[in-house]
Amino acid sequence: MCIRDRYSSSLETVEKILKENSGYDIVLDLHRDAIGDNTYAPTVKIGEEYAAQLMFVIGSNGGVDEHENWQENLKFAVKVQEKANELYPGLFKPIILRNSDYNQFVSKAACIIEVGATGNTLEQCLASMKYLSKVIREL
């Protein structure tokens, strides 16, 4: 299945969930960064544990796919990242802008978050999700 087909399929799921749960306004598309080989595992030490580093990927109007929410999505990512830097310095790598929409037009707070890379352990990825949830609760 090509990437365009995967996003078409996931769009149906996201739209169904948003329709059934009108109170949701944050849409997080979680991925693992496929960069490098299995030895690349970006981490940050928080307290006594290592967490996989996170990275926002925000689609923009720069490509074929245009959507009006991309600047709001970017503002949301910056807001989350600023709070994360305050609470857990180093949890996030710099935000990446891409020339695609990645279905991020569905909300003004929709984004991809890359959770570590292929070398990170499940425990490191779960630790980063724990910290991310605490950051979002603080917003």
Give the positions of each predicted feature.
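Active-site-adjacent substrate-binding region
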Residues: 69-96
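Active-site-adjacent mobile loop/cap segments within catalytic or ligand-binding domains
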Residues: 93-139
